[in-house]
Amino acid sequence: MDKTYQPHAIETSWYQTWESENYFAPQGAGDSYTIMIPPPNVTGSLHMGHGFNNAIMDALIRFRRMQGRNTLWQPGTDHAGIATQMLVERQIEAQGQNRHDLGREKFLEKVWEWKDQSGGNISRQIRRLGSSVDWSRERFTMDDGLSEAVKEAFVRLHEDGLIYRGKRLVNWDTKLHTAISDLEVENHDEKGFLWNLKYPLADGAKTAEGNDYLIVATTRPETMLGDSAVAVNPEDERYKALIGKFVELPLVGRRIPIIADDYCDPEFGTGCVKITPAHDFNDYEVGKRHNLPLLNIFDKNAAVLPACQVFNLDGSLNDSVDGKIPAEYVGLDRFEARKQIVAAFDAAGLLVSVDDHALKVPKGDRSGTVIEPWLTDQWYVSTKPLAEPAIAAVEDGRIAFVPKQYENMYFSWMRDIQDWCISRQLWWGHRIPAWYDESGKVYVGRDEAEVRAKHNLGPDVALQQDNDVLDTWFSSGLWTFSTLGWPEQTDFLKTFHPTDVLVTGFDIIFFWVARMIMLTMHLVKNEDGTPQVPFKTVYVHGLVRDGQGQKMSKSKGNVLDPLDIIDGIDLETLVQKRTTGLMQPKLQKAIEKQTRAEFADGIASYGTDALRFTFCSLATTGRDIKFDMGRVEGYRNFCNKIWNAARYVLDKGEDCGQNGEAYELSLADRWIISQLQRTEAEVTRQLDQFRFDLAAQALYEFIWNQYCDWYLELSKPVLWDENSPVERQRGTRRTLVRVLEVALRLAHPFMPFITEEIWQRLAPLAGSTGKTIMLQPWPVANETRIDQGAEDDIEWLKGLMLGTRNIRAEMNIGPGKPLALFLKNVSAEDQRRLTENEALLKKLARLESITVLAAGDEAPLSATALVGEMEVLVPMAGLIDKGAELARLDKEIQRLQGEVQRVGGKLSNPSFVDKAPAEVIEKERAKLAEAEQALGKLAEQHARISSL
């Protein structure tokens, strides 16, 4: 083995070996165990969140594979409708064209070309993360097989009355020209205005105050062109007499009714609200309650139409309402129309006032444009009938959320679910399998031939397929079963579905998780006809944040690429990476400054195993993950520790009883074997409970503290002593080898590369056969090998050695200087342990003698430590330079006194205490307490040495 651990020297070659040997394919004889990778968008590259959930999924898959389960971890990517189309459109626009210049077919060819070029980027990253996915089953949501499954799902849901087409109000993205879901809308807090406008009363009606007008308050005066009513609260005494009367809509001259509805808040503005059902979601609900006409005033760009499109609530045309719009507003953008309409109200003396008002402005999460509630024909899934069984599946435990608290989030969403708009006005995606004849009649089928055959439509009937595509979440909602061959009843579908675990972030529980449950349970059935769930457990993790707890985002300039931590990156390349392609170029300087301050030397190469172990160690259930580069460095050191321990073991491991020779186990051997059983049980228990953090902690504690720090040291006196019996030496060698081999198997799910590299060399000595650690059996604790007596004896030994070490450190005595040790208050058990381990103790603690003091014996002036009730004494006379040590202590005491004075003064200063933040004051108090405690210890030490 190389002297130092170099991750890059082993990682790529081992991955290539595993993949070429087909080790990732299902092959266990046990029950199936399936995880479907949440498909990343084909547009992008993996970020830290992907890195995190890949580490978690691979830990689970490798763990279960070693347990003998028939594991399938299936990879794939999502076509990411809007994101991909936007990206390719930008590339085309850079060449002076747009998608309409190319036409649908040519544009889609460009998208497929781009997908083929960039799609490999994600699979390359997944490989670098060490993910043991079955590449032979890689899927893409636009693959032929998946496209057939999408069509089948749509047709079946339509036949079951769960998909319908309707004219409804949607979130319309005026830049992308598509409907988007509520979950793709971001509400931004902005300062806006509230316009108070006069609406004249019709037919000579007057208010209680004698006014011939009502004052309505609105944040969107431009939509008044489409008003259908003015609403007041039924309990509002000011307006009760006017309910059922009319106002004359200014600028337009249309008579609209005054209606009573609880939606109106009498305390807001004047208590009168204009109702525009075609351009406001709340108004739409009011319109439904009062059967108001829907007047659409905008085109797809949110520019004013030549005349309102007037509809009834069922989507049919309404010819009875005058939809005229004054010519001066036709063609104006909505915000320009706002200015001109307000000016017209002002000129007519109808503008009462303009008040400042805090607004929540809805914007598209991808386009950034203000979303317009707009009336369009869209396809919908009727979700309430699908939600009921999906809620029941979680309630009765067929699906469990880990942590359980996320069930409440799921239930609250599902119990208030709205119908799902699944059509998108895009070109990239699964085209809706519906056709229209020239009269507009719609036919749904798997293809045009099926439609014609089913409805007896001859070649003389022209059919046109719907131009819209399905919401990306519709196809990814079928992910667990469509990728296994559904609707065909394939062997893979029968074997690996339902899947076992879904690993996902909490932010897509509704986007994806809930929809997968609903669609799967409706479309996939068990042999007895009951609904099949898509997965048995949903493991929900938080967001991966930066070291300061900030969300990682391009605009904050704090994004980390997992591969840059694995391979390293120099500062200039990192700065360039973080500042290129910013949506807001003005942030460039601040991001560059921040990056140069945080990563002055760039990022070192830490390797995949250190990063993966970091992710697992941070995987506390449900909470956001604060990513800390210091942890990665610490776990890189952990890799080095394992590497160096392996080099020592391989150097000393020959003749370890591998051929059946006799051996004898020492106390230390029995102790480490006993500790190993406890660690095996603990790591298994925590992995079973998805506590990756506690499993990693148990592993780290065993390998670093118990095996490397203690057991390797305890082994040296046995192996280096020529007088040690051969059987004893062989027993220690055997234990060194076999305990390390088991520890490597325990660590393999977290750190696959380093464990494979070492295991290959260690396996012959440990008597292990097989080509790879990946397919070795998972360690199972053997309770008969837990030796409480050995554990107690070693704890006593460790206590004695640590006590002696502490005295050396406190008294500044060099580690190589032999000490005389006195023991006081020694019990019979202490005496037994001392008798059995005296030679070992002397070697490890560098002791020249050990003297047990009888009761009443006078002890020399000594530094002391306690092991249980036994006192450990080291006489000081002649061991230290008294004058030099006192001078050193005086200097340190003086420094600490200054610190106590400085911090104490600050805390007794009222102007500091009154103005400083609470956390700063708390920090200073902790600093003072620490300094005072250290000062007390030094004073005691000073007194002890002075008395020598």
Swiss-Prot record:
Amino-acid positions noted as binding ATP in the UniProt annotation, renumbered to this chain: 554
UniProt motif ('KMSKS' region) ranges: 551-555
Compartments where found: Cytoplasm
Keywords, comma-separated and alphabetical: Aminoacyl-tRNA synthetase, ATP-binding, Coiled coil, Cytoplasm, Ligase, Nucleotide-binding, Protein biosynthesis
InterPro entries named among the record's database cross-references: aa-tRNA-synth_I_CS, aa-tRNA-synth_Ia, Anticodon_Ia_Val, M/V/L/I-tRNA-synth_anticd-bd, Rossmann-like_a/b/a_fold, tRNA-bd_arm, tRNAsynth_Ia_anticodon-bd, Val-tRNA_synth_C_sf
GO molecular function: aminoacyl-tRNA deacylase activity; ATP binding; valine-tRNA ligase activity
GO annotation (BP), single: valyl-tRNA aminoacylation
PROSITE patterns named among the record's database cross-references: AA_TRNA_LIGASE_I (PS00178)
GO CC, one annotated term: cytosol
Self-association and partners: Monomer.
Name of the protein this chain belongs to: Valine--tRNA ligase
